[in-house]
């Protein structure tokens, strides 16, 4: 078999796995399964209840990023159908669309229209996050291209209400024990540019355009977009109390996705998008990559003397802030996982708009490296590199990263990058 046919077969196997094993009865994508038998997690999996004690860990964690995973799967299957008109892809996309609508209705009934909750245990919760919104909204946008007229009308309404919700709450929220605070001040705040402008990709929306302009200039999200962690550290600044890259592939994916929407919704800001993507590609893309296996290191320290990243010994890193007191957030060592799927997404966006074929080739190579066995929850050289209480990571399959792999693969194909 050729490399191309192997990748295509892998994509079909991944798509089938998500549909048949990871989706629950409402077609929400659980972000983890038991690795050995691909069954839903249970008490025996050993996931700690470290965020909300009254919800068992095996019900809470699989749904922590279910909105993101389902949105990514919706985008991937929609792109797949547009490319090949596959009946299987259309069926899967419709299931994922149902799931996103289900979460939307949970928020509407439990709080207000436009609130998109984290559906712990498949049910309503008072918690959400901006990345859930951006992924779900992006999935809806891709599905819109293949949706029926009634579905398209529903999607336009949902996107408008979801963007409006953030304006209504002044981009502020609380999360478990964390106090309510504005989300516009940190490094990943530029993702809101994607949320704010996305409805205007489907219909004329002076309100969304005006709000996006306000965020760019008055809230200085334009300045934040072109900045990078590397640049901050070179200026002698810190982030989260120190100079570490900690799961930085997530901000990279969010920022590049926001630039994707801004580029197309508001062409006047393409220079901002271009500089943002150039800085992302030159300063941060693939810094955390383990080239031997295509996985990303979870946490790495910036060394100002060498102007490079380095691993730290296993153990708690006291200088890093950890307001939720989660050991995995500040535990050093050489643990790795398939977060590189998010780095690849950012590379695809950058390669598309910067016309960089070498970046596209590197992205494709990483996808090639990520064989099915690479989606285990954690890889490390010895047990002491596993954060205390998180031994279960060796026993789970990360389905969200499989969904991101699929989105990467079909997005790259749709842009003729491979």
What positions do the PLM features span?
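Hydrophobic core segments within long, regular secondary-structure runs in both alpha-
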Residues: 4-19, 74, 90-104, 137, ...
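Low-complexity, Ser/Thr/Pro/Gly-enriched N-terminal "stalk/linker" regions
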Residues: 1-68, 94-95, 99-116, 150-167, ...
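Carbohydrate-binding/catalytic loop surfaces
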Residues: 27-62, 109-129, 174-193, 231-264, ...
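Inter-helical turn/loop segments and adjacent helix faces that build the functional surface
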Residues: 80-87, 143-156, 202-207
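Terminal, non-catalytic domain-edge segments
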Residues: 1-24, 146-150, 256-418
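Aromatic- and glycine-enriched pocket-lining scaffold segments that form the walls
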Residues: 128-195
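Non-membrane alpha-helical segments in proteins
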Residues: 62, 68-82, 122, 135-139
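Short glycine/serine- and small hydrophobic-enriched flexible loop segments
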Residues: 75-83, 138-145, 194-201, 260-264
